[in-house]
Amino acid sequence: MCVHFSQVRMSNLILADHKGRVVEGRHAINRAGFVLHAAVHDEYPEVMAMCHAHTTYGTAWCATGRPLDMISQDAAAFYNSHAVIGASAGAVAVEKESGLSVAQQIGRNRGVLHQNHGLLTCSHHSIDDAAFWFIALERACKQQLLVEASGIKPQLLSEKTARYSREHVGSDYIGWLHFQTLYNHIAETQPTCSPEARRAPPPR
């Protein structure tokens, strides 16, 4: 908490238990962030990693309360794999019940558009996978907003095409693979981010 994104390092991350107590690290915990993350991991023990933030385009699109339209291959990666959740819309989740009301609606979805709030992605495989799909979901929201702003009715992908694209570009392996280039760039350009950190192997 109180660490700018540009200053986040492996050395200043914290480890917290499911009661919100800091086990490792010297920073305080963000209560609202913890409540949501803890609820997801309690509800879905198989979830390896979850990403959540209030990004510009994601938060803007979440205000519409609508799922993504299948306007591109990027959006198709989330075909039948993302959900709009209206529970606790716009409210700061500081109570356990608020986190649970959101977590219980995630199901098997890779991405979540939390209405009036922001984006959330989950992975059953790795942090790499969850992180890439978070970036991809933000990009898909940006594309949707740009199309809407044009005032031109978009040509949507057919269900068959969207399903086909998701099967080929929406897997855990693709998420993991695409994040490797991002990780390598970070490791090379951010000298305080250790490239020797243990990496998750590719999904089988």
Q: Where do the protein language model's features map onto the residues?
A:
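Glycine-rich flexible loops
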Residues: M1-R204
